[in-house]
Amino acid sequence: MITKAKPVQGKNAIAKTHKFDAFIFDIDNVLIDTRKSYLESIIKTIEVYLSYGQIPFFSASKGASRKPLLTLEDIEEFKLLGGFNDDWDCTYGLLVYLLSLPVKKRTLDELRSKIAIAAFVKKIKNRPLGTSGITDMLGAHTGIKIERIGRIFQEIYLGKSLFTQTEKTRPVFWKKRGLMDREKLVFRPQLLEKLKEAGIQLGIATGRPRFEAIFALRKFEILDYFDAITTMGEVKEAEAIQKTSLRKPHPFSLLETARQLGAKKKFLYIGDLPDDVNAANAAKKDINIQSAGFPLFAANPFHAQQELKKSQR
């Protein structure tokens, strides 16, 4: 974990020595391990998107033992470009990249052989990149629709039963259990309880839709520890009014959670991506906030830590 605050010990040490009044958390891979849910959903959404339909982009690989098109390391590396905190946006950006690759055969196996995410990311110096940046660089593809991405992604993540319940329609692309069932709690609830006992308020600023955020927090019995929550739902509502993107690294979700907690407090924001750190940096214009990088679940923690350090100031 990267933090500018020095570690201390003892009861109420955080409150007394660090003098933070409130902690704001991201959810994914900070409070809840989502490597096998959200990140895997990105991979499977891309595979379905490219290989499903009467005239698919690519023919699917044969055999039950076929390798996935992308790895978790690929997804993590791509997200370091910035502007891809939202998983639908990340999926969109990856599809733009994949469909720009030169292939001789229209098969997923051939496409896999051309993928070099790390090399592509290394070349990009102007960050955050985001969906607009990658389409400016590689060109927009008329076959990539965010609505279709969202539909496939939600079917895979929620699973047949919950998707039908929440969307009031039956799944088309995925009729199995949802990958959200694979999620695990990162910390024991007692840690949050100790923070509350120390007089620290707790908030959340997440890119999850509100239903998915509340569902997960309630499932792991930690919802009641949080005094304020800002989700993608509130971000989209504000975007509709302001006619601009307010997703991380924009500080909107942090500022909104801080407003609910009391904006004059001193905040610590804990996230796992450069977008999180950059959002906190941007929020410093309006509130007293520091950030802590939390690359615990990165496939390459040292590399992730170095990228987070570049963003911190």
Regions found by a protein language model. Give the residues of each.
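Active-site neighborhood of HAD-like aspartate-dependent phosphohydrolases
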Residues: I2-T71, D89-Y92
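Conserved Rossmann-like nucleotide-cofactor binding loop
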Residues: V30, S37, R210, D275, ...
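Non-catalytic, alpha-helical, charged scaffold/linker segments
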Residues: F58-K160
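Acidic, Mg2+-coordinating phosphoryl-transfer loop and its flanking beta/alpha structural elements
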Residues: Y269-R313
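Short, acidic loop-to-helix structural element flanking the phosphoryl-transfer center
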Residues: K11-I14, K19, I24, A140, ...
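Receiver (REC) domain switch/active-site residues of two-component response regulators
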Residues: D28, D227, Q312-R313
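Substrate-recognition "cap/lid" segment bordering the active-site pocket of phosphatases
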Residues: K175-V186, Q190, G203, P209-L268, ...
